[in-house]
């Protein structure tokens, strides 16, 4: 009788389809994989949700991939590293296969579940696979577990397998401490990111330094950490200053369940109680006590000294323009619009049929708006007040047979050089605006 990838009393089946990664949260079904580009290595796409034990609550997980080959294509890195137990091996027929251990799969899912946690109250612990967890290949073939709970997947031909369904989870609770740790080495690392777009900033490698050794229950404040960060910034990037803290996370003895510290208020971190750490003495082979570790990892936004934070909603530097297009013969308003622009250099005529002019603000014809057969006459009124600059462009009908790019105002037989010069500052960005707008 086949073993349905039985993990405890629950069956784990496995289902696949084909492709490579797009930025989506979950895989809805086989149809999703049909649109994915072909892959270079065989992969297991893990797209599962968590179901909280004893409730109807579901926990969403972002999908991820596990490379089933010994080396990623193009020198890349796998998104999830698995232990040596899960590795490719040759079958009797010579084809490569990959054996996935149940514990490795659960660990990879646990790490993905934790990766996007933003609060200490949001931690869940993965218990086991639910009964609907399934692996298939692109043909719908189900892959069953061996007696030891592992699953063997072929890596040739190159394809993707899909692990879907659910894992059972429960709120994380710390285990009772049997042998309390005596002291903790508090280590520190920091990462800086420019708040404003900044091509000059070159982040260095993150160095880890030992801050101090503390006893269980001793404290370190957010101000002490800020001082450490500023000291490192002054040394490596003297032209910058810290703007604000983005995150502070404490990793306890490489435990995946970390302490997330507040980022928007002052805090005091109290060294967490935990089990005493040990290592094996290479000579004696016996366990010996070592200092436990807390790694405090921080991220800060920084600014160039003297620079203000960029505000995408700040319009104080923009100027308001009202553009009116008027029939020169009837004074009928053909079209009106208001524009905000940071540069008056864009106040120039554009040809709607010429993509090179797309940054310019004034139109030499209105065909695109269904107002046909008009062109420039050379008459432009330019009026200013404290908050608005009003440009009135007078337009006339094009001669019959002329196309939309015809410029009546550029015809030297109709307008003198002096008349053309009157409005030239609107057409040539290098010509200054008159001191007195009425002197035109």
From Swiss-Prot:
Top-level lineage group: Bacteria
Key word Ribosomal protein present: no
Statement: the UniProt record of this protein carries the keyword Signal: yes
UniProt xrefs under SUPFAM superfamilies: Staphylokinase/streptokinase
Keywords: Plasminogen activation, Signal, Virulence
Signal peptide: 1-26
A GO term from the CC aspect: extracellular region
Known role: This protein is not a protease, but it activates plasminogen by complexing with it. As a potential virulence factor, it is thought to prevent the formation of effective fibrin barriers around the site of infection, thereby contributing to the invasiveness of the cells.
Name of protein: Streptokinase C
